[in-house]
UniProtKB/Swiss-Prot annotation:
One Pfam family from the record: FSIP1
Family: Belongs to the FSIP1 family.
Organism from which the protein derives: Mus musculus
One annotated GO biological process: axoneme assembly
Keyword terms, alphabetized: Coiled coil, Phosphoprotein
Gene designation per UniProt: Fsip1
InterPro entries according to UniProt: Fsip1 (IPR026246)
A cellular component term, taken from the record's GO annotations: acrosomal vesicle
Protein's name in the database: Fibrous sheath-interacting protein 1
């Protein structure tokens, strides 16, 4: 409610004490503030009455003074009872802030000082609770490290002694030990044996580290509003803000360094990818090396197949077409030897046929080697050869069926060795006869 003063003097308004006045930039200023609020409605009525008559104004002023004195007594009682209640919750070891004595009769200043003192006590109590919670968090982390070291030792002992209940548990333990590096257990043990460092980050950037909280409680604190940084002033030796938060700055610096390295790696990878932007598959050097290792592992796995599969893959040489395997060439050589033994009358026919057949195969192989077909032509040629082989096999099966039927219908009358040789020679010639 605004106060309209039409006429009168300001002698009735009390002035603040000289000790409560302070400049905003001075460091020696006390914690008191001066709050000016508009006068209540009763004062306005008293001022109007004072303008009307001097005697009535004198009586009204005396009434106002009586009311102020009664309000003073009430605020004094409240300020005595409230700190007594709040001090019961506080720690007795915590130093209590000492209020500066002010020789002033203004109830507003006393009220403001009481509110500020209560707020300071509450702030100190909350700081103490925060420090206790941080100590509790340290203890929990320490217990976690102890349990991790104990678990690691149990797993190592179980692996060495193999006294587990079943094979599944043993297998799971071995898998866990393979996946988890030994450096994790060593790091946990070293962190447990060495001094447990404070890895907690402050909630606010103006928070004081808990290890220096108790030492700095009795010292003078001021806050620079422009920089928004706490300035700690000591009597013996002043130190900067960076020295005050040195235990916490190591972890933050490591985190910042790790982020910087990650960003540099990301930039390098983008540069490497930009170099190979025209290639169909974009890979950096590390990815190429990893791909080569995987392909090499696949080649090693393929080389460890069975001997039969190895023999089948051995005679399929890329770019040379179909070639006979070693076993098939041996079988053909044995057949040629048998034919030479059986062909007593006409040995030249089979030799000429075999030579011509070998010559044709060599010519075909030379032609295939000389001409380098494209991938599409190679696929067409392979399909054509496959169809030719299938048709040839079908024809051979038909001839064999016809020969078997002829043999069943016309049994041999003269079972002599010569006739048998001629018959076998004729059968083999029919089978090996090219289309």
């Amino acid at each position: 409610m605004p106060m309209d003063i039409i006429k009168g003097n300001l002698d009735g308004i009390s002035k603040p004490a000289s000790s409560s006045r302070s400049r905003p930039g001075s460091r020696s200023s006390n914690g008191s503030l001066e709050v000016l609020t508009p006068e209540p409605g009763s004062v306005k009525i008293d001022m109007v009455n004072k303008l009307n008559s001097g005697q009535e104004g004198h009586t009204s002023n005396s009434g106002v003074e009586e009311r102020r004195n009664s309000n003073d007594a009430k605020w004094a009682d409240d300020s005595k009872t409230k700190p007594a209640k709040e001090s019961s919750d506080e720690d007795p070891d915590m130093p209590q802030p000492q209020a500066t004595p002010e020789h002033s009769d203004d109830p507003k200043l006393e009220e403001t000082n009481a509110v500020l003192q209560n707020a300071i006590r509450k702030m100190h109590r909350l700081d103490k609770l925060l420090a206790k919670k941080q100590c509790r968090e340290k203890e929990v982390k320490k217990q976690g490290l102890e349990m991790r070291v104990k678990l690691w030792e149990e797993l190592k002992s179980a692996k060495n002694t193999e006294d587990l209940e079943n094979d599944e548990e043993l297998g799971n333990t071995k898998k866990f030990l393979c996946l988890t590096s030994e450096s994790a257990g060593k790091a946990a043990a070293e962190a447990l044996h060495c001094e447990f460092e404070d890895a907690l980050f402050s909630v606010f950037h103006t928070q004081i580290p808990p290890e220096t909280y108790e030492n700095l409680m009795e010292k003078d604190f001021t806050c620079d509003v422009e920089k928004n940084e706490p300035l700690i002033i000591t009597e013996k030796q002043p130190f900067s803000n960076t020295e005050a938060i040195e235990p916490r700055s190591e972890d933050s610096q490591g985190f910042i360094r790790q982020n910087a390295e990650h960003s540099q790696d990301f930039i390098k990878r983008n540069i490497e990818l930009a170099k190979h932007s025209r290639s169909p598959v974009v890979m950096v050097e590390g990815e190429k090396k990893r791909l080569d290792e995987l392909l090499q592992g696949l080649d090693d796995a393929d080389s460890g197949l069975s001997s039969a599969e190895g023999d089948q893959c051995g005679w399929l040489v890329p770019g040379e077409g179909y070639t006979l395997a070693a076993t098939e060439s041996q079988q053909l050589a044995e057949i040629d030897i048998k034919l030479q033994e059986l062909s007593v009358d006409s040995p030249t026919i089979f030799s000429l046929e075999s030579q011509s057949h070998k010559g044709d195969m060599e010519c075909d192989a030379n032609e295939e080697r000389n001409t380098e077909p494209t991938p599409g032509e190679k696929i067409l040629r392979d399909r054509k050869e496959q169809r030719d082989r299938e048709s040839r096999l079908r024809a051979i099966d038909g001839k064999l069926k016809e020969l078997s039927e002829q043999v069943e219908e016309c049994p041999m009358i003269t079972p002599s060795k010569r006739n048998e040789r001629i018959t076998w020679r004729w059968l083999l010639a029919k089978i090996l006869e090219p289309e």
